[in-house]
Amino acid sequence: MQSALFLAVQHECGPMDKGAGTGPKNEEKREKMKRTLLKDWKSRLSYFLQNSSSPGKPKTGKKSKQQTFIKPSPEEAQLWSEAFDELLASKYGLAAFRAFLKSEFCEENIEFWLACEDFKKTKSPQKLSSKAKKIYTDFIEKEAPKEINIDFQTKSLIAQNIQEATSGCFTTAQKRVYSLMENNSYPRFLESEFYQDLCKKPQITTEPHAT
């Protein structure tokens, strides 16, 4: 668990402390930040465990504005390890993966991918154009608030494409971000303590017979 976070904070999408030295104070600062990340990661993902219904037992009562996720069975959770698409197809899995990416400072990757999925379903030319510009300003242009890590050539191509937006404007960038998540964050998610706990089958305890 800790090793996964340590790798994450050194990954290009979420450096921990740029320009930090190697002295005792800086080392102590990095260790403190790493402990904070670990605590934050556990608290975020434990939320899903505490606020999810058991499989086949949806919550009843007043509807909440907040979306309720049905906690998967161990068998369902194990399917996520078979393919990245299996994880993304699960509402619970997607929510947990987003929390994991947030702990790695890479949440913009999944947000961009989801924005592209929504964009491709858009039929209206007017909406297509406005959504294309929003995706560009949010994720693509230099110093965008959620700037994704793609090459300059791809960014330039997108800047040209959005002038006459089509559903394929962001295809190349989406594929690159998908590959980045699949090859980096996804394997670390599968190694996380949270995911391993989901895959564990509950132990059946039997009470000793009275003599």
Curated annotation (Swiss-Prot):
Gene Ontology cellular component annotations, sorted alphabetically: cytoplasm; nucleolus; nucleus; plasma membrane
CDD domains for the chain: RGS_RGS2 (cd08709)
Keywords associated with the record: Cell cycle, Cell membrane, Cytoplasm, GTPase activation, Membrane, Nucleus, Phosphoprotein, Signal transduction inhibitor, Translation regulation
Post-translational events: Phosphorylated by protein kinase C. Phosphorylation by PRKG1 leads to activation of RGS2 activity.
Function field: Regulates G protein-coupled receptor signaling cascades. Inhibits signal transduction by increasing the GTPase activity of G protein alpha subunits, thereby driving them into their inactive GDP-bound form. It is involved in the negative regulation of the angiotensin-activated signaling pathway. Plays a role in the regulation of blood pressure in response to signaling via G protein-coupled receptors and GNAQ. Plays a role in regulating the constriction and relaxation of vascular smooth muscle. Binds EIF2B5 and blocks its activity, thereby inhibiting the translation of mRNA into protein.
GO biological process: negative regulation of signal transduction; regulation of translation
Region listing for Necessary for membrane association, in residue ranges: 32-66
Subcellular location: Cell membrane; Cytoplasm; Nucleus, Nucleolus
Domain RGS: 83-199
Database matches in PROSITE patterns: RGS
Gene3D superfamilies: 1.10.196.10, Regulator of G-protein Signalling 4, domain 2
Protein name according to UniProt: Regulator of G-protein signaling 2
InterPro entries documented for this protein: RGS, RGS2_RGS, RGS_sf, RGS_subdom1/3, RGS_subdomain_2
Ranges for region Necessary to inhibit protein synthesis: 79-116
